[in-house]
């Protein structure tokens, strides 16, 4: 699995805004949207393209389009914040959904939604979730995708924790690459990333007050 940490001043500035506990929900959302576009741009670097002739107002030129646009799969809830940024970069991408909540006692993922194409064979998949902490949610989602034939999965996360990265590397699953803005060193006793940025879902949308 390739691990790609995007080193860029604009990436760092948006990540700083997201980390800052003073950032309000709207400021956090705006920074996440900007950072999401940057990470999707980087994740798309290896997508295959077809060439075709295009007529400019002056002459002919070579045109380029994606051979197979990826399917964007957010892990709900926080992953929803990355859908619009991804679609702004790849407007012809299809979107699937995986809903997972975190059991605050066990820190294990609790699935509650799955809306995916039946056959993902041969299709690039961008699995998006702002946070990679223990890796439990991401691994659960990857197994769902693999069960439908996905064999080219790119995980796009804003912040990854070293324990989650190691869990992803150790899993025998079809993960091609991880694209992230940073790898933080550890998790606390509540399995939150340290230093991290808190609960991305809460900072996007407010506290979740429904037990699943």
Swiss-Prot record:
Report the cofactor remark. Binds 1 Mg(2+) ion per subunit. The magnesium is bound as Mg-PRPP.
Identify the residues that bind uracil: 193, 198-200
The UniProt annotation places 5-phospho-alpha-D-ribose 1-diphosphate binding at 77, 102, 129-137, 199
Q: What GO biological process terms does the UniProt entry carry, in alphabetical order?
A: UMP salvage; uracil salvage
- Enzyme Commission number(s): 2.4.2.9
- Any one Pfam family here would be UPRTase
- Provide the cofactor list for this protein: Mg(2+)
Q: Which InterPro entries match?
A: PRibTrfase_dom, PRTase-like, Upp_B, UPRTase/APRTase, Ura_phspho_trans
How is the activity of this protein regulated? Allosterically activated by GTP.
Coiled-coil annotated residue ranges, if any: none
Query: GO: which molecular function terms?
Result: GTP binding; magnesium ion binding; uracil phosphoribosyltransferase activity
Print the keywords alphabetically. Allosteric enzyme, Glycosyltransferase, GTP-binding, Magnesium, Nucleotide-binding, Transferase
Its UniProt entry gives the catalysed reaction(s) as: UMP + diphosphate = 5-phospho-alpha-D-ribose 1-diphosphate + uracil
Kindly indicate whether the keyword Amino-acid biosynthesis belongs to this entry: no
Query: What does the sequence similarity comment in the record state about its family?
Result: Belongs to the UPRTase family.
Cross-referenced HAMAP family, in alphabetical order? Upp_B (MF_01218_B)
In UniProt terms, what function does this protein have?
A: Catalyzes the conversion of uracil and 5-phospho-alpha-D-ribose 1-diphosphate (PRPP) to UMP and diphosphate.
Full protein name: Uracil phosphoribosyltransferase
Question: Where does this protein come from, organism-wise?
Answer: Corynebacterium kroppenstedtii (strain DSM 44385 / JCM 11950 / CIP 105744 / CCUG 35717)
